[in-house]
Amino acid sequence: SATSGAANYTSEPDLTVAHICEALGKVSASLDMSHDRLLEAPAHLGVAGIVTQADAQTLARHLPLKRCRISDDQLTSTIGALGDRDGALVGVGTGSFVALKRGDMVRSLGGWGLALGDQGSGAWLGRSALQRCALVADGLAPMSAMIASLLGQFDDDRGQMISFARTATPADYARLAPRIF
């Protein structure tokens, strides 16, 4: 096994490719297998942010793997966690989803991405906290220690907050979530 950085195809496709390639290099080293041999092996990747078959095909074309299937991470996470057993999985990280597995059937809810959902995820919590900061800064909500801490991170500067939000990825928002608790 190997780890690399975040991979969300919807929000950061180029970084997703880079991190998958980095992980492949680490896997070949940990298995004492030639990199070329690893790239010939069949692989199935569950990647956050894969929404359509076209997304999966485009990502596969940008990877060095010769026999690669790609799906969203909900299916692979559910099967990986439950194996052959029936059960439920709540996936909460940068995004969020709930899945139910019964026999060969897997049904999931959520996983819509930050633009439309991901309630309870780190990204959703971080973005919601910044939205609350804006309300407090405008005098429409009361100040709290959490809000003061977040505002302080941006030097109480509206411009810094807006600049951050303009380019923030779900992972950027999720990094704010620990300040909430």
Place the predicted regions along the sequence by residue.
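Glycine-rich phosphate-binding loop plus the immediately following alpha-helix
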Residues: S108-Q153
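Conserved phosphate-binding catalytic cores of ATP/NTP-utilizing and phosphoryl-transfer enzymes
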Residues: L65-V90, D104-M105
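Gly/Thr-rich phosphate-binding beta-strand-loop-beta motif of the actin/hexokinase/Hsp70
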Residues: S1, G87-R102
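Glycine/charged-rich beta-loop-alpha catalytic/anionic-binding loops adjacent to active sites
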Residues: A60-R61, K66, M105-G113
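Stable alpha-helical structural segments in soluble proteins, enriched in small hydrophobic residues
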Residues: T16-S34, A81
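Short glycine-rich, Thr/Ser-proximal phosphate-binding strand/loop in the N-terminal lobe
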Residues: S1-A18, K26, V106, G111
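Short beta-strand-loop/turn "lid" adjacent to the catalytic site in phosphate-handling enzymes
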Residues: T3-Y9, S28-I70, R166
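A mobile "lid/hinge" subdomain adjacent to the ATP/sugar-phosphate binding pocket shared
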Residues: P142-F181
